[in-house]
Amino acid sequence: MMPAARESLLDAAYTALVRRPWSAVRMVDVAAVAGVSRQTLYNEFGSKEGLARALVRREADGYLAGVDRALAAHADTRDRLAATAEWTVAASRNNALVRAMLTGCWGERLPAPTLSAVPSSSAVPAQRRADGPLPAPTDFVALVRERAVAVLSAPGTPKSDTVELARSCELAVRIALSCVAAPPGEGGVTDLVRTALPRQFGRPLNHL
């Protein structure tokens, strides 16, 4: 199956999940919305559990792609980390799967695939990846921190500065996650992040 066709199946599954609990989502209905046979759906994902894993993997990848965009949107280091925190809060507010992945709170309406890898005999590379380990909340903290450090650290940055940068990046992520659980007041997550980070982070790291 072409990647676009797989995406249409995942879109159909996501739409079904928005409308009803995952336990009430039927494979035959997902296939019908996507315009394929139920057997085609099973050939691609293996099972409803496989479909759930693929959907969670896609939403995880989408969230991390948004992190990359946020980090690239500004020159100022604090602005980049604030934008990343804003994206995290917005993505969690607008996407129940992202919220569940970042907090570990799945709820009865959502699929709850095991985060550890499952046996896979799929011939579909994308499904084999989905059947591998899925990120836990602590994994997302590390993934976002590592992405931020890679973007924000200049070539030749001293190790001590890189360590401090990593701490600040993780702080921004954890502030964002706290705002997912308890929405912030006036000023939002942006003010919280900018206030918490050292003032020197208002300049590019290679100017510190």
Q: What is the predicted role of each segment?
A:
Residues 46-50, 72-76, 93, 184:
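Residues in soluble alpha-helical coiled-coils and helical-bundle/repeat scaffolds
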Residues 20-23, 95:
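Short coil/turn segments at alpha/beta junctions that flank glycine-rich nucleotide-binding fingerprints
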Residues 4, 8-15, 19, 33, ...:
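Alpha-helical structural segments
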Residues 11, 28-31, 44, 68, ...:
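A general secondary-structure boundary signal
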Residues 78-208:
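An extended, acidic
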Residues 23-50, 54:
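Helix-turn-helix
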